[in-house]
From Swiss-Prot:
The modification Leucine amide is found at L11. This is Extended FMRFamide-9. Belongs to the FARP (FMRF amide related peptide) family. The keyword Secreted applies. It comes from the Eukaryota.
Length: 11
């Protein structure tokens, strides 16, 4: 989804 949280989860 959109948002910083979504990016961190992918790390």
């Amino acid at each position: 989804g959109r948002g910083a949280s979504s990016n961190y989860v992918r790390l």
